[in-house]
Amino acid sequence: MEGESSRFEIHTPVSDKKKKKCSIHKERPQKHSHEIFRDSSLVNEQSQITRRKKRKKDFQHLISSPLKKSRICDETANATSTLKKRKKRRYSALEVDEEAGVTVVLVDKENINNTPKHFRKDVDVVCVDMSIEQKLPRKPKTDKFQVLAKSHAHKSEALHSKVREKKNKKHQRKAASWESQRARDTLPQSESHQEESWLSVGPGGEITELPASAHKNKSKKKKKKSSNREYETLAMPEGSQAGREAGTDMQESQPTVGLDDETPQLLGPTHKKKSKKKKKKKSNHQEFEALAMPEGSQVGSEVGADMQESRPAVGLHGETAGIPAPAYKNKSKKKKKKSNHQEFEAVAMPESLESAYPEGSQVGSEVGTVEGSTALKGFKESNSTKKKSKKRKLTSVKRARVSGDDFSVPSKNSESTLFDSVEGDGAMMEEGVKSRPRQKKTQACLASKHVQEAPRLEPANEEHNVETAEDSEIRYLSADSGDADDSDADLGSAVKQLQEFIPNIKDRATSTIKRMYRDDLERFKEFKAQGVAIKFGKFSVKENKQLEKNVEDFLALTGIESADKLLYTDRYPEEKSVITNLKRRYSFRLHIGRNIARPWKLIYYRAKKMFDVNNYKGRYSEGDTEKLKMYHSLLGNDWKTIGEMVARSSLSVALKFSQISSQRNRGAWSKSETRKLIKAVEEVILKKMSPQELKEVDSKLQENPESCLSIVREKLYKGISWVEVEAKVQTRNWMQCKSKWTEILTKRMTNGRRIYYGMNALRAKVSLIERLYEINVEDTNEIDWEDLASAIGDVPPSYVQTKFSRLKAVYVPFWQKKTFPEIIDYLYETTLPLLKEKLEKMMEKKGTKIQTPAAPKQVFPFRDIFYYEDDSEGEDIEKESEGQAPCMAHACNSSTLGGQGRWII
């Protein structure tokens, strides 16, 4: 067997990173290895003084040297390669390298099919014809790798012969010093993996070489690293491979500076198997990186590797010493783990990332120290995973290939964070426990670079933009939303343009003015061109029908199932975004307000009330009332939530709770309650007066102190806050207070006359029906009740409305099913003749004539409205109110007048 192997030619495919050459000769390798071993021995025996002197002389000469890689690692590897070469040749035709995962089969044509069945299935089998002579059977590759190695054969032979001719001690020292100077120049530009080769300073200022570890495991890990790099080299484009080769050369030829300016050579390990495995694994790893990385990435990787290995360490006195190699087992395993993850990184890197590294990038070698803290974490993680088998490692690589396509596009340095927890271990183990200032600076620079480039490479989040647009549309369309999105139009200009359509617009809130300027001004101009006035108040039947038609048309246009989904989108969270997009796309505001001459927001409120499935559910039961009280005690005045819980509209529950919130009296009002009501209404009316009105009244009082104060008619029944009145009365709700005040006001405006009793009542009914028939309106909302009040007398409009409601309910059958014109026609044609006949009979019986109703007054003396029937009862109320001043028409209330001491109206 030994004789046959001596006839084999050496076919050694080596990675481009280390530039190991493919040599085809028989006798030179053994001789070469003996010479290297002898030279390295002589170098160790030289004195430090002689070395320092020779370094200073030869330094300038070697600056122009064409050598681009150091032969130190070559000598170390070749010196140890001869010890166990014969043992490996004694292997039979079959051989398995567990670390590299490749089974080598040396067979001839006869025993090609005689492969044993018990061989592992997760390794590659390579068949080599025995007719081809081989000297190193431990360096087989797949056919794909052999083709790549042969492509570099001519180039490798030329470089190998060139190095062999210049191999001696003098050139070794010159190369070391030259690489040391080059490393100093390129050190600030090197990337994070340059930090793997930190050196320690000796006590005398001299940095010496650490003895190479003689442990098998460490050599295995280095060998694994080289094999993985071969994989990377196969997948890399040419540009990236060139850059990676340059980086590897600089890394291998890194010398160290000792205390006395000496540059001792690196001591090669004496173990033959360790050297071989180191070479094989590094080359394999380089090939695997080449498989997964583009040209630009390989260029940067090789440059970074060269700079890493050629980094010198300067001692206290300027000497350069070799890198001390740790002799610990764990550190060697960290190198192995690092090589495996370099292989994983090359496979998993997406194309978009690969294109981001045109030159000088170190995707496979810069990962370990992108962030110092992550590297420390990875150091701990690798300790727990260092004993995993080769089978599990290969499985993880396969998974990485599958999952590599699912990665999102990260920033340049975010790719490194995927593996820095493992790859950083090798750098941290070789650097030692103490951190270096240079390392901190490098990490800081990388961190800042990462922060700057991450936003640029991060893809835009389109889903987030869509959700933001939907939310803004919801706020824009929601009836309960605030006015934060109102336009910043000039308030004065908006008021001036809107006053043409709404005379009292300046009295509205600023947010309301801006909203109407934005949403309604153009619509108002269109209605003006058509001759239609803008309306407020209760919707007419015609407007309700038009609104219903607009909603149905919009549902048909968009395909939304129901009006409840359209107007109460929050009740359907799963379809909320879709409905909101449809509203925005088909201009919901324009469709819903078509042909309705009202502000858009009032139209929207009316639509919500009309199409609310929880509205119009009839009277509240006792159980509903108790639930309402319970939910209000828990949620407060959150009427929207309470309405959803009791299946009622928010307006309905708010109105009902105002009636049952506390114990209220029913039936006839007592005198004390009546006085409280009069006082409360008076305070609320005076509180509402503007400062300008107060100044005008004050000036009139100063001119004529004896004059009687008066109050405008409309202020007695318009704009009163009945909620405040209810709070002051305490024993009645706001509806009871409003009804009772209308009764009191009518009596005092008519000076106590009974205008709707007996013959006067018949006369008022006849006059009311005739007036309603004359105005010829289509809906009750079109009636001017202020003007119609003159048909009865000097009464408030609400009094007339009450009498009309009573009239149609008594005289018109099924009035709920009739329109307003139909009701008026029935009253005029059927009821009016009967009422006139009855009135004539009564006049004949009593012998009196019909009295003409009194004309309405526009101004009333204040004391004619706000007074008490009995002053003694007022004194009793004063005692009951614990010192509160009674409200009398001729009394003086300084607190109400703001210190003026007079009633102001």
Curated annotation (Swiss-Prot):
Record field: compositional bias (Polar residues): 410-419
Bias (Basic residues): 163-174, 215-226, 270-283, 330-339, 385-401
Region (N-terminal region (NRD)), start-end ranges: 1-223
Main location: nucleus
Residue positions where Phosphoserine is found in the record: S65, S240, S403, S478, S481, S487, S872
Chain positions covered by the region annotation May be involved in interaction with ARF: 498-886
Cross-link (Glycyl lysine isopeptide (Lys-Gly) (interchain with G-Cter in SUMO2)): K700
Segments of this protein annotated with the region Disordered: 1-33, 151-443
CC per GO annotation: fibrillar center; nucleolus; nucleoplasm; nucleus
Keyword Metal-binding on entry: no
Superkingdom of this protein's organism: Eukaryota
Modified residues (Phosphotyrosine): Y476
Segments of skewed composition (Basic and acidic residues): 1-16, 24-33
PROSITE patterns, A to Z: MYB_LIKE (PS50090)
One of the protein's GO biological processes: transcription initiation at RNA polymerase I promoter
Zinc-finger listed as a keyword: no
InterPro entries tied to this protein: SANT/Myb, TTF1-like
Molecular-function annotations in GO: chromatin binding; DNA binding
Function: Multifunctional nucleolar protein that terminates ribosomal gene transcription, mediates replication fork arrest and regulates RNA polymerase I transcription on chromatin. Plays a dual role in rDNA regulation, being involved in both activation and silencing of rDNA transcription. Interaction with BAZ2A/TIP5 recovers DNA-binding activity.
Subunit structure, interactors included: Oligomer. The oligomeric structure enables to interact simultaneously with two separate DNA fragments. Interacts with BAZ2A/TIP5. Interacts with CAVIN1. Interacts (via the N-terminal region (NRD) and a C-terminal region) with CDKN2A/ARF; the interaction is direct. Interacts (via C-terminal region) with NPM1/B23.
Name of the molecule in the record: Transcription termination factor 1
Organism: Homo sapiens (Human)
Gene: TTF1
